[in-house]
Amino acid sequence: MTIIYFILAALALGILVLIHELGHLVVAKAVGMAVESFSIGFGPALFKKRIGGIEYRIGCIPFGGYVRIRGMERTKEKGEKGKIDSVYDIPQGFFSKSPWKRILVLVAGPLANILLAVLAFSILYMNGGRSKNYSDCSKVVGWVHPVLQAEGLLPGDEILTCNGKPYVGDKDMLTTSLLEGHLNLEIKRPGYLTVPSKEFAIDVEFDPTKFGVPCSGASYLLYGNQVPLTKNSPMENSELRPNDRFVWMDGTLLFSMAQISQILNESYAFVKVARNDKIFFSRQPRVLASVLHYTPYLRNELIDTQYEAGLKGKWSSLYTLPYVINSYGYIEGELTAIDPESPLPQPQERLQLGDRILAIDGTPVSGSVDILRLVQNHRVSIIVQQMSPQELEEVNSRDADKRFIASYHSEDLLQILNHLGESHPVEVAGPYRLLDPVQPRPWIDVYSSESLDKQLEVAKKIKNKDKQRYYLERLDAEKQKPSLGISLKDLKVRYNPSPVVMLSNITKESLITLKALVTGHLSPQWLSGPVGIVQVLHTGWSVGFSEVLFWIGLISMNLAVLNLLPIPVLDGGYILLCLWEIVTRRRLNMKIVERILVPFTFLLIIFFIFLTFQDLFRFFG
Protein backbone atom coordinates (compact mmCIF):
# COMPACT_ATOMS: atom_id res chain seq x y z
CA MET A 1 0.00 0.00 0.00
CA THR A 2 2.91 2.37 0.70
CA ILE A 3 3.99 2.21 -2.96
CA ILE A 4 0.41 2.90 -4.08
CA TYR A 5 0.17 5.89 -1.73
CA PHE A 6 3.50 7.19 -3.03
CA ILE A 7 2.30 6.90 -6.64
CA LEU A 8 -0.94 8.68 -5.74
CA ALA A 9 1.03 11.41 -3.93
CA ALA A 10 3.30 11.97 -6.94
CA LEU A 11 0.20 12.02 -9.15
CA ALA A 12 -1.43 14.65 -6.92
CA LEU A 13 1.68 16.85 -7.13
CA GLY A 14 1.67 16.40 -10.90
CA ILE A 15 -1.96 17.57 -11.02
CA LEU A 16 -1.06 20.72 -9.07
CA VAL A 17 1.69 21.54 -11.57
CA LEU A 18 -0.51 20.59 -14.53
CA ILE A 19 -3.33 22.91 -13.41
CA HIS A 20 -0.91 25.82 -12.95
CA GLU A 21 0.76 25.44 -16.34
CA LEU A 22 -2.57 24.72 -18.03
CA GLY A 23 -3.79 28.12 -16.84
CA HIS A 24 -0.85 29.79 -18.58
CA LEU A 25 -1.36 27.70 -21.73
CA VAL A 26 -5.08 28.35 -22.18
CA VAL A 27 -4.86 32.12 -21.70
CA ALA A 28 -1.68 32.43 -23.81
CA LYS A 29 -3.45 30.78 -26.73
CA ALA A 30 -6.57 32.87 -26.11
CA VAL A 31 -4.67 36.18 -26.44
CA GLY A 32 -2.85 35.02 -29.59
CA MET A 33 0.55 34.01 -28.26
CA ALA A 34 2.41 31.11 -29.89
CA VAL A 35 3.14 28.38 -27.34
CA GLU A 36 6.22 26.34 -28.28
CA SER A 37 6.19 23.69 -25.55
CA PHE A 38 4.18 22.55 -22.54
CA SER A 39 6.11 20.46 -20.02
CA ILE A 40 5.29 18.69 -16.79
CA GLY A 41 8.66 18.16 -15.15
CA PHE A 42 12.14 19.35 -16.07
CA GLY A 43 15.15 17.80 -17.78
CA PRO A 44 15.29 15.32 -20.68
CA ALA A 45 11.88 14.22 -21.91
CA LEU A 46 10.55 10.80 -20.97
CA PHE A 47 7.70 11.37 -23.40
CA LYS A 48 7.01 14.08 -25.96
CA LYS A 49 4.58 14.63 -28.78
CA ARG A 50 3.88 17.62 -31.02
CA ILE A 51 0.21 18.50 -31.41
CA GLY A 52 -0.99 21.64 -33.19
CA GLY A 53 2.46 23.20 -33.18
CA ILE A 54 2.96 22.68 -29.44
CA GLU A 55 5.40 20.12 -28.08
CA TYR A 56 3.82 18.37 -25.10
CA ARG A 57 6.41 16.64 -22.90
CA ILE A 58 6.94 14.94 -19.57
CA GLY A 59 10.36 15.63 -18.02
CA CYS A 60 12.41 13.12 -16.06
CA ILE A 61 12.47 15.43 -13.00
CA PRO A 62 8.77 15.48 -12.05
CA PHE A 63 8.88 18.36 -9.54
CA GLY A 64 7.58 21.35 -11.50
CA GLY A 65 6.83 22.33 -15.07
CA TYR A 66 6.78 25.18 -17.56
CA VAL A 67 5.09 26.69 -20.61
CA ARG A 68 7.54 28.08 -23.19
CA ILE A 69 6.00 30.96 -25.13
CA ARG A 70 7.67 32.28 -28.26
CA GLY A 71 10.00 35.20 -27.59
CA MET A 72 9.88 34.94 -23.83
CA GLU A 73 13.45 33.74 -23.43
CA ARG A 74 15.27 35.13 -26.50
CA THR A 75 16.62 38.55 -27.36
CA LYS A 76 16.97 37.83 -31.08
CA GLU A 77 15.00 35.65 -33.42
CA LYS A 78 14.66 35.09 -37.15
CA GLY A 79 11.47 36.12 -38.80
CA GLU A 80 10.17 35.65 -42.31
CA LYS A 81 11.93 38.83 -43.53
CA GLY A 82 15.23 38.24 -41.71
CA LYS A 83 16.66 38.84 -38.28
CA ILE A 84 14.41 40.41 -35.66
CA ASP A 85 16.32 42.62 -33.26
CA SER A 86 13.68 43.04 -30.55
CA VAL A 87 11.52 40.51 -28.71
CA TYR A 88 8.70 43.04 -29.09
CA ASP A 89 8.71 42.43 -32.84
CA ILE A 90 8.48 38.62 -32.76
CA PRO A 91 5.16 37.59 -34.33
CA GLN A 92 2.81 36.01 -31.77
CA GLY A 93 5.60 36.44 -29.22
CA PHE A 94 5.08 37.02 -25.51
CA PHE A 95 6.37 40.61 -25.62
CA SER A 96 4.56 41.41 -28.87
CA LYS A 97 1.30 41.58 -26.92
CA SER A 98 0.24 44.47 -24.72
CA PRO A 99 1.38 44.46 -21.06
CA TRP A 100 -2.20 43.87 -19.92
CA LYS A 101 -2.48 40.71 -22.06
CA ARG A 102 0.85 39.51 -20.70
CA ILE A 103 -0.41 40.09 -17.15
CA LEU A 104 -3.50 38.00 -17.94
CA VAL A 105 -1.26 35.12 -19.04
CA LEU A 106 0.96 35.44 -15.97
CA VAL A 107 -1.95 35.64 -13.53
CA ALA A 108 -3.68 32.66 -15.15
CA GLY A 109 -1.34 30.08 -13.57
CA PRO A 110 -1.76 31.20 -9.94
CA LEU A 111 -5.47 31.81 -10.60
CA ALA A 112 -5.82 28.21 -11.78
CA ASN A 113 -4.21 27.07 -8.51
CA ILE A 114 -6.61 29.28 -6.52
CA LEU A 115 -9.58 27.80 -8.39
CA LEU A 116 -8.27 24.29 -7.69
CA ALA A 117 -7.95 25.19 -4.00
CA VAL A 118 -11.52 26.55 -4.01
CA LEU A 119 -12.74 23.33 -5.64
CA ALA A 120 -10.83 21.12 -3.17
CA PHE A 121 -12.04 23.07 -0.13
CA SER A 122 -15.62 23.21 -1.46
CA ILE A 123 -15.72 19.42 -1.90
CA LEU A 124 -14.16 19.05 1.54
CA TYR A 125 -16.77 21.40 3.05
CA MET A 126 -19.69 19.59 1.41
CA ASN A 127 -18.19 16.29 2.55
CA GLY A 128 -18.29 17.44 6.18
CA GLY A 129 -14.68 18.57 6.60
CA ARG A 130 -11.89 16.54 8.14
CA SER A 131 -11.09 14.96 11.48
CA LYS A 132 -8.46 16.62 13.63
CA ASN A 133 -7.18 15.99 17.11
CA TYR A 134 -8.95 18.25 19.58
CA SER A 135 -5.60 19.67 20.70
CA ASP A 136 -4.94 21.01 17.17
CA CYS A 137 -7.85 23.45 17.33
CA SER A 138 -8.33 23.92 21.07
CA LYS A 139 -8.56 27.36 22.67
CA VAL A 140 -8.00 25.67 26.02
CA VAL A 141 -4.36 25.52 27.08
CA GLY A 142 -2.86 22.08 27.71
CA TRP A 143 0.74 23.02 28.48
CA VAL A 144 2.23 26.44 29.23
CA HIS A 145 5.81 27.67 28.95
CA PRO A 146 7.19 28.70 32.39
CA VAL A 147 7.62 32.30 31.17
CA LEU A 148 3.87 32.58 30.52
CA GLN A 149 3.00 30.55 33.61
CA ALA A 150 4.90 33.06 35.74
CA GLU A 151 2.59 35.75 34.31
CA GLY A 152 -0.53 33.83 35.37
CA LEU A 153 -1.47 31.63 32.39
CA LEU A 154 -2.22 28.07 33.55
CA PRO A 155 -3.17 24.76 31.92
CA GLY A 156 -6.95 24.63 31.55
CA ASP A 157 -7.31 28.36 30.84
CA GLU A 158 -9.26 29.36 27.75
CA ILE A 159 -7.62 32.02 25.56
CA LEU A 160 -10.10 34.45 24.02
CA THR A 161 -7.86 36.79 22.03
CA CYS A 162 -4.18 36.98 21.10
CA ASN A 163 -2.82 40.48 20.41
CA GLY A 164 -6.32 41.78 19.78
CA LYS A 165 -7.37 39.02 17.35
CA PRO A 166 -9.73 36.10 18.04
CA TYR A 167 -7.74 33.08 19.18
CA VAL A 168 -8.15 29.84 17.22
CA GLY A 169 -5.37 27.54 18.45
CA ASP A 170 -1.79 27.28 19.69
CA LYS A 171 -0.46 28.02 16.19
CA ASP A 172 -1.82 31.58 16.58
CA MET A 173 0.28 32.20 19.67
CA LEU A 174 3.42 30.79 18.06
CA THR A 175 3.16 32.85 14.86
CA THR A 176 2.18 36.01 16.75
CA SER A 177 5.10 35.75 19.15
CA LEU A 178 7.42 34.91 16.25
CA LEU A 179 6.49 38.06 14.33
CA GLU A 180 5.74 40.56 17.10
CA GLY A 181 7.95 39.38 19.96
CA HIS A 182 5.29 39.84 22.61
CA LEU A 183 1.91 38.42 23.58
CA ASN A 184 -1.17 40.25 24.82
CA LEU A 185 -3.69 37.63 25.84
CA GLU A 186 -7.27 37.91 27.07
CA ILE A 187 -7.96 34.81 29.14
CA LYS A 188 -10.93 33.12 30.76
CA ARG A 189 -10.33 30.75 33.66
CA PRO A 190 -13.20 28.25 33.90
CA GLY A 191 -14.37 27.31 37.38
CA TYR A 192 -12.75 23.89 37.73
CA LEU A 193 -13.32 22.18 41.10
CA THR A 194 -13.28 24.92 43.77
CA VAL A 195 -11.46 27.54 41.66
CA PRO A 196 -13.75 30.51 40.86
CA SER A 197 -14.23 31.50 37.23
CA LYS A 198 -12.62 34.76 36.16
CA GLU A 199 -11.39 36.72 33.16
CA PHE A 200 -8.05 38.51 33.05
CA ALA A 201 -5.30 39.60 30.66
CA ILE A 202 -1.52 39.32 30.49
CA ASP A 203 1.07 41.16 28.42
CA VAL A 204 4.50 39.59 28.18
CA GLU A 205 7.59 39.70 25.98
CA PHE A 206 8.12 36.29 24.38
CA ASP A 207 10.66 35.29 21.73
CA PRO A 208 10.09 31.70 20.52
CA THR A 209 13.55 31.59 18.91
CA LYS A 210 14.91 31.97 22.46
CA PHE A 211 12.29 30.25 24.62
CA GLY A 212 10.68 27.75 22.25
CA VAL A 213 6.98 27.00 21.83
CA PRO A 214 4.78 29.19 24.10
CA CYS A 215 2.00 26.67 24.71
CA SER A 216 0.12 23.66 23.37
CA GLY A 217 -3.59 22.91 23.10
CA ALA A 218 -5.48 20.82 25.64
CA SER A 219 -5.97 17.14 24.90
CA TYR A 220 -8.21 14.28 25.95
CA LEU A 221 -5.91 11.72 27.56
CA LEU A 222 -7.83 8.65 26.53
CA TYR A 223 -6.77 5.06 27.00
CA GLY A 224 -7.91 2.82 24.16
CA ASN A 225 -7.36 -0.86 23.52
CA GLN A 226 -5.70 -0.17 20.14
CA VAL A 227 -2.30 -0.07 21.86
CA PRO A 228 -2.32 -2.63 24.70
CA LEU A 229 -0.36 -2.14 27.90
CA THR A 230 3.17 -3.46 27.79
CA LYS A 231 3.96 -6.60 29.74
CA ASN A 232 5.95 -4.69 32.37
CA SER A 233 3.69 -1.65 32.54
CA PRO A 234 3.13 -0.30 36.08
CA MET A 235 -0.54 0.09 35.04
CA GLU A 236 -0.91 -3.64 34.31
CA ASN A 237 -2.85 -4.39 37.50
CA SER A 238 -4.59 -1.03 37.85
CA GLU A 239 -7.97 -2.21 36.48
CA LEU A 240 -7.73 0.32 33.68
CA ARG A 241 -10.53 -0.02 31.12
CA PRO A 242 -10.82 0.98 27.46
CA ASN A 243 -12.15 4.53 27.08
CA ASP A 244 -10.83 5.57 30.50
CA ARG A 245 -9.66 9.17 30.39
CA PHE A 246 -6.91 10.44 32.70
CA VAL A 247 -8.31 13.58 34.37
CA TRP A 248 -6.34 14.03 37.61
CA MET A 249 -2.93 13.07 38.95
CA ASP A 250 -1.25 14.03 42.23
CA GLY A 251 -3.39 17.11 42.85
CA THR A 252 -3.28 18.32 39.25
CA LEU A 253 -6.16 18.42 36.78
CA LEU A 254 -4.77 16.97 33.57
CA PHE A 255 -4.95 18.74 30.22
CA SER A 256 -1.92 17.32 28.37
CA MET A 257 0.67 14.55 28.23
CA ALA A 258 3.30 17.16 29.10
CA GLN A 259 1.74 17.52 32.56
CA ILE A 260 1.87 13.76 33.14
CA SER A 261 5.49 13.65 32.03
CA GLN A 262 6.34 16.54 34.35
CA ILE A 263 4.67 14.91 37.36
CA LEU A 264 6.45 11.60 36.71
CA ASN A 265 9.86 13.18 36.24
CA GLU A 266 9.76 15.55 39.19
CA SER A 267 10.87 14.04 42.50
CA TYR A 268 7.88 15.10 44.58
CA ALA A 269 5.61 13.38 47.10
CA PHE A 270 1.87 14.06 47.11
CA VAL A 271 1.15 15.04 50.70
CA LYS A 272 -2.15 15.46 52.56
CA VAL A 273 -1.79 18.05 55.33
CA ALA A 274 -3.89 19.24 58.28
CA ARG A 275 -3.38 22.87 59.31
CA ASN A 276 -5.67 23.89 62.18
CA ASP A 277 -9.17 23.15 60.85
CA LYS A 278 -8.07 23.13 57.22
CA ILE A 279 -7.06 20.06 55.19
CA PHE A 280 -5.24 20.45 51.89
CA PHE A 281 -2.94 18.64 49.46
CA SER A 282 0.52 19.81 48.48
CA ARG A 283 3.32 18.41 46.35
CA GLN A 284 6.50 18.39 48.45
CA PRO A 285 10.04 17.69 47.20
CA ARG A 286 11.58 14.30 47.91
CA VAL A 287 15.26 14.98 48.57
CA LEU A 288 18.24 12.89 49.59
CA ALA A 289 18.99 13.19 53.29
CA SER A 290 22.67 13.57 52.42
CA VAL A 291 22.08 17.01 50.84
CA LEU A 292 20.29 18.41 53.92
CA HIS A 293 21.89 20.19 56.84
CA TYR A 294 21.18 18.15 60.03
CA THR A 295 22.35 18.74 63.56
CA PRO A 296 23.90 15.61 65.11
CA TYR A 297 20.74 15.12 67.19
CA LEU A 298 18.38 15.36 64.18
CA ARG A 299 20.63 13.08 62.15
CA ASN A 300 20.52 10.41 64.87
CA GLU A 301 16.73 10.80 65.10
CA LEU A 302 16.41 10.20 61.35
CA ILE A 303 18.71 7.16 61.54
CA ASP A 304 16.49 5.73 64.30
CA THR A 305 13.40 6.36 62.17
CA GLN A 306 15.12 4.68 59.23
CA TYR A 307 15.78 1.61 61.39
CA GLU A 308 12.15 1.49 62.63
CA ALA A 309 10.90 1.77 59.04
CA GLY A 310 13.00 -1.26 58.07
CA LEU A 311 15.00 0.70 55.52
CA LYS A 312 18.44 -0.87 55.17
CA GLY A 313 19.86 1.37 52.47
CA LYS A 314 22.78 3.72 52.90
CA TRP A 315 22.38 7.28 54.15
CA SER A 316 23.44 8.54 50.71
CA SER A 317 20.41 6.89 49.08
CA LEU A 318 17.81 7.73 51.75
CA TYR A 319 14.99 10.04 50.62
CA THR A 320 13.10 12.30 53.00
CA LEU A 321 11.06 15.51 53.10
CA PRO A 322 13.01 18.71 53.91
CA TYR A 323 11.33 19.16 57.28
CA VAL A 324 11.84 18.18 60.91
CA ILE A 325 8.96 15.76 61.49
CA ASN A 326 8.20 14.33 64.93
CA SER A 327 7.05 10.79 65.58
CA TYR A 328 3.37 11.81 65.24
CA GLY A 329 3.82 13.43 61.83
CA TYR A 330 3.84 17.05 62.98
CA ILE A 331 6.13 19.62 61.40
CA GLU A 332 8.61 21.03 63.93
CA GLY A 333 10.89 22.91 61.56
CA GLU A 334 12.31 23.27 58.07
CA LEU A 335 15.63 21.92 56.79
CA THR A 336 18.00 23.65 54.40
CA ALA A 337 20.50 22.45 51.82
CA ILE A 338 24.15 21.96 52.82
CA ASP A 339 25.25 23.66 49.62
CA PRO A 340 23.58 27.09 49.30
CA GLU A 341 24.46 27.13 45.59
CA SER A 342 22.30 24.02 45.04
CA PRO A 343 18.89 25.12 46.37
CA LEU A 344 16.16 22.59 47.09
CA PRO A 345 13.17 22.22 44.75
CA GLN A 346 10.31 24.51 45.71
CA PRO A 347 7.21 22.95 47.33
CA GLN A 348 3.75 23.67 46.00
CA GLU A 349 3.01 25.21 49.42
CA ARG A 350 5.59 25.44 52.17
CA LEU A 351 4.60 23.50 55.30
CA GLN A 352 4.42 25.42 58.57
CA LEU A 353 5.18 24.71 62.20
CA GLY A 354 2.34 22.64 63.65
CA ASP A 355 1.13 21.21 60.31
CA ARG A 356 0.43 17.49 60.46
CA ILE A 357 1.02 15.09 57.58
CA LEU A 358 -1.99 12.79 57.15
CA ALA A 359 -1.11 10.87 53.98
CA ILE A 360 1.69 10.34 51.47
CA ASP A 361 0.82 9.54 47.84
CA GLY A 362 -2.75 8.72 48.82
CA THR A 363 -1.77 6.31 51.62
CA PRO A 364 -2.70 7.29 55.24
CA VAL A 365 0.21 7.65 57.69
CA SER A 366 0.32 7.63 61.49
CA GLY A 367 3.73 9.20 61.99
CA SER A 368 7.31 9.77 60.87
CA VAL A 369 8.06 6.06 60.36
CA ASP A 370 5.27 5.67 57.78
CA ILE A 371 6.22 8.96 56.15
CA LEU A 372 9.88 8.00 55.73
CA ARG A 373 9.01 4.57 54.37
CA LEU A 374 6.54 5.93 51.79
CA VAL A 375 8.72 8.76 50.45
CA GLN A 376 11.42 6.30 49.33
CA ASN A 377 9.39 5.61 46.19
CA HIS A 378 6.97 7.94 44.48
CA ARG A 379 3.58 6.40 43.72
CA VAL A 380 1.18 8.52 41.70
CA SER A 381 -2.49 8.89 42.57
CA ILE A 382 -4.68 8.82 39.45
CA ILE A 383 -8.36 9.49 38.82
CA VAL A 384 -9.84 8.34 35.52
CA GLN A 385 -13.16 9.10 33.87
CA GLN A 386 -15.04 6.40 31.99
CA MET A 387 -16.18 8.09 28.78
CA SER A 388 -19.67 7.25 27.53
CA PRO A 389 -20.35 6.54 23.83
CA GLN A 390 -22.01 9.96 23.55
CA GLU A 391 -18.91 11.68 24.97
CA LEU A 392 -16.72 9.87 22.45
CA GLU A 393 -18.74 11.09 19.47
CA GLU A 394 -17.06 13.48 17.08
CA VAL A 395 -18.41 17.03 17.45
CA ASN A 396 -17.88 20.17 15.40
CA SER A 397 -14.73 22.04 16.39
CA ARG A 398 -16.88 25.12 17.16
CA ASP A 399 -18.49 23.24 20.06
CA ALA A 400 -15.43 21.27 21.15
CA ASP A 401 -14.08 23.73 23.74
CA LYS A 402 -17.44 24.07 25.46
CA ARG A 403 -17.78 20.28 25.65
CA PHE A 404 -14.22 19.85 26.90
CA ILE A 405 -14.58 22.37 29.74
CA ALA A 406 -17.95 20.92 30.75
CA SER A 407 -16.49 17.38 30.84
CA TYR A 408 -14.88 18.05 34.25
CA HIS A 409 -17.69 17.29 36.72
CA SER A 410 -16.58 19.08 39.87
CA GLU A 411 -19.10 17.56 42.29
CA ASP A 412 -18.18 13.97 41.46
CA LEU A 413 -14.45 14.70 41.45
CA LEU A 414 -14.63 16.45 44.82
CA GLN A 415 -16.40 13.45 46.35
CA ILE A 416 -13.29 11.39 45.65
CA LEU A 417 -10.76 14.12 46.46
CA ASN A 418 -12.32 15.03 49.81
CA HIS A 419 -11.78 11.47 51.08
CA LEU A 420 -8.44 10.78 49.41
CA GLY A 421 -5.76 9.64 51.85
CA GLU A 422 -8.27 8.21 54.33
CA SER A 423 -8.40 4.60 55.47
CA HIS A 424 -11.70 4.15 53.57
CA PRO A 425 -11.50 6.46 50.54
CA VAL A 426 -14.33 7.03 48.07
CA GLU A 427 -13.15 5.12 45.02
CA VAL A 428 -16.08 5.73 42.65
CA ALA A 429 -18.21 8.82 42.08
CA GLY A 430 -20.26 9.23 38.91
CA PRO A 431 -18.04 8.44 35.90
CA TYR A 432 -14.82 8.80 37.96
CA ARG A 433 -12.70 6.09 39.58
CA LEU A 434 -9.70 6.36 41.87
CA LEU A 435 -7.05 3.87 40.79
CA ASP A 436 -4.70 2.20 43.24
CA PRO A 437 -1.48 4.24 43.60
CA VAL A 438 0.95 3.38 40.80
CA GLN A 439 4.73 3.39 41.07
CA PRO A 440 6.33 4.45 37.75
CA ARG A 441 9.27 2.43 36.44
CA PRO A 442 12.27 3.44 34.34
CA TRP A 443 11.51 3.33 30.63
CA ILE A 444 14.16 0.66 30.08
CA ASP A 445 12.37 -1.63 32.58
CA VAL A 446 8.96 -1.09 30.99
CA TYR A 447 9.65 -1.55 27.31
CA SER A 448 11.29 -4.51 25.67
CA SER A 449 14.89 -4.47 24.51
CA GLU A 450 13.49 -4.74 20.96
CA SER A 451 12.11 -1.19 21.24
CA LEU A 452 15.51 0.06 22.35
CA ASP A 453 17.28 -1.89 19.60
CA LYS A 454 14.98 -0.34 16.97
CA GLN A 455 15.79 3.16 18.19
CA LEU A 456 19.50 2.36 18.22
CA GLU A 457 19.21 1.19 14.62
CA VAL A 458 17.57 4.51 13.74
CA ALA A 459 20.47 6.32 15.42
CA LYS A 460 23.04 4.35 13.42
CA LYS A 461 21.43 5.49 10.16
CA ILE A 462 21.82 9.19 11.02
CA LYS A 463 24.65 10.45 8.83
CA ASN A 464 25.28 13.70 10.69
CA LYS A 465 27.60 12.81 13.60
CA ASP A 466 26.49 15.72 15.78
CA LYS A 467 22.82 14.85 15.35
CA GLN A 468 23.58 11.17 15.90
CA ARG A 469 25.40 11.95 19.17
CA TYR A 470 22.52 14.20 20.29
CA TYR A 471 19.98 11.46 19.48
CA LEU A 472 22.00 8.84 21.41
CA GLU A 473 22.37 11.15 24.42
CA ARG A 474 18.64 11.79 24.44
CA LEU A 475 17.96 8.07 24.12
CA ASP A 476 20.28 7.32 27.04
CA ALA A 477 18.51 9.92 29.18
CA GLU A 478 15.07 8.66 28.16
CA LYS A 479 15.96 5.11 29.24
CA GLN A 480 15.99 6.13 32.90
CA LYS A 481 12.94 8.39 32.84
CA PRO A 482 9.94 7.18 34.87
CA SER A 483 7.17 5.74 32.73
CA LEU A 484 3.67 4.33 33.17
CA GLY A 485 4.04 2.19 30.05
CA ILE A 486 0.80 3.44 28.57
CA SER A 487 -0.22 5.08 25.32
CA LEU A 488 -2.92 7.77 25.50
CA LYS A 489 -4.74 9.34 22.56
CA ASP A 490 -6.78 12.45 21.89
CA LEU A 491 -10.40 12.64 20.76
CA LYS A 492 -11.16 13.69 17.20
CA VAL A 493 -13.28 16.72 16.32
CA ARG A 494 -14.86 17.65 13.01
CA TYR A 495 -13.05 20.66 11.55
CA ASN A 496 -15.11 22.18 8.75
CA PRO A 497 -14.65 25.92 8.15
CA SER A 498 -16.01 27.43 4.93
CA PRO A 499 -13.81 27.49 1.80
CA VAL A 500 -13.49 31.29 2.15
CA VAL A 501 -12.14 30.95 5.70
CA MET A 502 -9.73 28.22 4.58
CA LEU A 503 -8.40 30.34 1.70
CA SER A 504 -8.04 33.37 3.96
CA ASN A 505 -6.24 31.43 6.70
CA ILE A 506 -3.81 29.77 4.30
CA THR A 507 -3.00 33.06 2.58
CA LYS A 508 -2.32 34.71 5.95
CA GLU A 509 -0.16 31.80 7.09
CA SER A 510 1.82 31.87 3.83
CA LEU A 511 2.49 35.60 4.16
CA ILE A 512 3.39 35.22 7.85
CA THR A 513 5.86 32.46 6.95
CA LEU A 514 7.44 34.63 4.25
CA LYS A 515 7.69 37.57 6.64
CA ALA A 516 9.31 35.33 9.26
CA LEU A 517 11.81 34.12 6.65
CA VAL A 518 12.71 37.64 5.56
CA THR A 519 13.09 38.90 9.14
CA GLY A 520 15.19 35.88 10.10
CA HIS A 521 12.69 34.56 12.66
CA LEU A 522 12.26 31.34 10.67
CA SER A 523 15.05 29.21 9.28
CA PRO A 524 14.71 27.91 5.69
CA GLN A 525 15.54 24.44 7.03
CA TRP A 526 11.95 24.19 8.34
CA LEU A 527 10.51 24.58 4.84
CA SER A 528 9.56 21.65 2.62
CA GLY A 529 10.49 21.16 -1.01
CA PRO A 530 8.99 18.82 -3.62
CA VAL A 531 10.06 15.63 -1.83
CA GLY A 532 8.48 16.91 1.38
CA ILE A 533 5.28 17.76 -0.48
CA VAL A 534 5.09 14.22 -1.88
CA GLN A 535 5.67 12.85 1.62
CA VAL A 536 2.84 14.99 3.04
CA LEU A 537 0.48 13.90 0.26
CA HIS A 538 1.54 10.29 0.84
CA THR A 539 0.56 10.63 4.51
CA GLY A 540 -2.71 12.25 3.46
CA TRP A 541 -3.63 9.32 1.21
CA SER A 542 -2.91 6.89 4.06
CA VAL A 543 -5.30 8.85 6.35
CA GLY A 544 -8.15 9.32 3.90
CA PHE A 545 -9.54 11.24 0.94
CA SER A 546 -10.59 14.25 3.04
CA GLU A 547 -7.01 14.71 4.21
CA VAL A 548 -5.79 14.56 0.60
CA LEU A 549 -8.30 17.23 -0.43
CA PHE A 550 -7.07 19.48 2.36
CA TRP A 551 -3.41 19.12 1.41
CA ILE A 552 -4.11 19.57 -2.31
CA GLY A 553 -6.00 22.78 -1.52
CA LEU A 554 -3.32 24.02 0.88
CA ILE A 555 -0.38 23.29 -1.42
CA SER A 556 -2.22 24.69 -4.44
CA MET A 557 -2.97 27.92 -2.56
CA ASN A 558 0.63 28.16 -1.38
CA LEU A 559 1.84 27.72 -4.96
CA ALA A 560 -0.44 30.57 -6.03
CA VAL A 561 0.83 32.90 -3.29
CA LEU A 562 4.46 31.93 -3.97
CA ASN A 563 4.20 32.50 -7.72
CA LEU A 564 2.60 35.92 -7.25
CA LEU A 565 5.51 37.22 -5.18
CA PRO A 566 7.26 40.12 -6.98
CA ILE A 567 10.48 38.15 -7.42
CA PRO A 568 12.22 37.93 -10.82
CA VAL A 569 11.78 34.52 -12.51
CA LEU A 570 8.41 33.98 -10.77
CA ASP A 571 5.09 35.06 -12.31
CA GLY A 572 4.89 37.96 -9.86
CA GLY A 573 8.27 39.24 -11.03
CA TYR A 574 7.15 39.32 -14.66
CA ILE A 575 3.89 41.01 -13.62
CA LEU A 576 5.95 43.71 -11.90
CA LEU A 577 7.91 44.27 -15.14
CA CYS A 578 4.66 44.59 -17.09
CA LEU A 579 3.32 47.13 -14.59
CA TRP A 580 6.57 49.07 -14.95
CA GLU A 581 5.96 49.25 -18.70
CA ILE A 582 2.41 50.50 -18.14
CA VAL A 583 3.54 53.19 -15.69
CA THR A 584 6.60 54.39 -17.67
CA ARG A 585 5.08 53.75 -21.13
CA ARG A 586 8.47 52.54 -22.26
CA ARG A 587 9.63 49.15 -23.48
CA LEU A 588 11.88 47.12 -21.24
CA ASN A 589 15.61 46.96 -21.90
CA MET A 590 15.92 43.19 -22.33
CA LYS A 591 19.66 43.17 -21.62
CA ILE A 592 19.00 44.68 -18.19
CA VAL A 593 16.10 42.28 -17.66
CA GLU A 594 18.35 39.31 -18.44
CA ARG A 595 21.00 40.58 -16.03
CA ILE A 596 18.33 40.66 -13.34
CA LEU A 597 16.83 37.27 -14.23
CA VAL A 598 20.05 35.23 -14.46
CA PRO A 599 21.20 35.59 -10.82
CA PHE A 600 17.67 35.09 -9.51
CA THR A 601 17.31 31.97 -11.65
CA PHE A 602 20.57 30.69 -10.19
CA LEU A 603 19.42 31.49 -6.63
CA LEU A 604 16.08 29.77 -7.24
CA ILE A 605 17.83 26.61 -8.47
CA ILE A 606 20.15 26.64 -5.43
CA PHE A 607 17.15 27.12 -3.10
CA PHE A 608 15.30 24.29 -4.86
CA ILE A 609 18.31 21.96 -4.44
CA PHE A 610 18.67 23.02 -0.78
CA LEU A 611 15.01 22.20 -0.02
CA THR A 612 15.28 18.87 -1.84
CA PHE A 613 18.33 17.85 0.17
CA GLN A 614 16.58 18.99 3.36
CA ASP A 615 13.60 16.80 2.47
CA LEU A 616 15.81 13.81 1.68
CA PHE A 617 17.77 14.28 4.90
CA ARG A 618 14.54 14.37 6.95
CA PHE A 619 13.18 11.36 5.05
CA PHE A 620 16.25 9.14 5.36
CA GLY A 621 17.37 10.46 8.77
From Swiss-Prot:
One of its GO terms (cellular component) is plasma membrane. Its cofactor is Zn(2+). It is found in: Cell inner membrane. Zn(2+) binds at H20, H24. It is a multi-pass membrane protein. Belongs to the peptidase M50B family. This is Putative zinc metalloprotease CPn_0344/CP_0416/CPj0344/CpB0350. It comes from Chlamydia pneumoniae. The lineage of its organism: Bacteria, Pseudomonadati, Chlamydiota, Chlamydiia, Chlamydiales.
